[in-house]
Amino acid sequence: MITLAIPSKGRLKEQALEVLAKAGLAISLPGDERKYHARVEGLDNVEIAFLSASEIAGEIGQGAVDLGITGEDLVRENLADWEARAEIAARLGFGHADVVVAVPEIWLDVDTMADLDDVAADFRQRHGRRLRIATKYWRLTQQFFSQKHGIQVYRIVESLGATEGAPAAGLADVIVDITTTGSTLRANHLKVLGDGVVLKSQACLVASKKARTAGDEATLRDIVTKMAAAVG
C-alpha cells in the first residue's frame, strides 16, 4: 500500500487535486470533510491522507507516508539531513514563495549579505550584543548565514507571531521570512537584500526513501512519472 499525503485545506489542496486529476489520478473525496482519508479511483493500493503541509514534511521524514505534496521550504527546514530521508520527485509549479533576508529600509547602506556581515561585526561593538534575526526558519537561516556567507556573529530569536513586525516592535534587527509578493515586507518598511533569497520554494511531490516492496516501489514510480508529465 502506498500512502500519498496532500494538503488538507485551502488553495494548496485545490491545486494539488488539480495536478493529480491532470495526471489521471482522480481522487474519490469523502462525503464528510472531517474525514482525512480518500482513495484514488482505480488504484486499490493507493491511499490518500489529508494533512497540513508542515505535517506532511514530518511524516515523509519519518517514513509514515510514501509520497507527499508540500512546500520545499518545509522539507528543507523540518527534516535534518533531509536528502538522506527524502527526495524531491517533481516540482509542481504552484505554491511559489521565496524565503528571504529582509532588513529595515532605513539601512540605506545595507544592500547585500556582505554589507550585513559588516553590520553584524559592528553591532557587537556599538550595541554590546549580537545582531538579532527573527525567523521561523532556524535551519535554513543558519545554513544561509553561517555556511554560505560566513556570517557568524548573530542570534536567532524565535518568531511567535508575524515575523515581519519584529523589527518595528524592537524584537529583532533583521528577519528571514517567506513571501510571495513582498507587499507585507514593504508595508512594514523592510527590504529584501539583493542576494538575500535563501530559497525559491514551491509545492513539490516528495518521496520518502523508506524501504518498501518492489510492487509498492513500482506503484510509487508510476505516480511520480504521471505527475511529472502532468506539470511538464
From Swiss-Prot:
Catalysed reactions, semicolon-separated: 1-(5-phospho-beta-D-ribosyl)-ATP + diphosphate = 5-phospho-alpha-D-ribose 1-diphosphate + ATP
- What's one GO MF term for it? ATP phosphoribosyltransferase activity
Q: What are the record keywords, sorted?
A: Amino-acid biosynthesis, ATP-binding, Cytoplasm, Glycosyltransferase, Histidine biosynthesis, Nucleotide-binding, Transferase
Main subcellular localisation: cytoplasm
UniProt-listed GO biological process terms: L-histidine biosynthetic process
Q: What does this protein do?
A: Catalyzes the condensation of ATP and 5-phosphoribose 1-diphosphate to form N'-(5'-phosphoribosyl)-ATP (PR-ATP). Has a crucial role in the pathway because the rate of histidine biosynthesis seems to be controlled primarily by regulation of HisG enzymatic activity.
- Show the NCBIfam families listed in the entry: hisG (TIGR00070)
In Swiss-Prot or TrEMBL terms, this protein is called ATP phosphoribosyltransferase
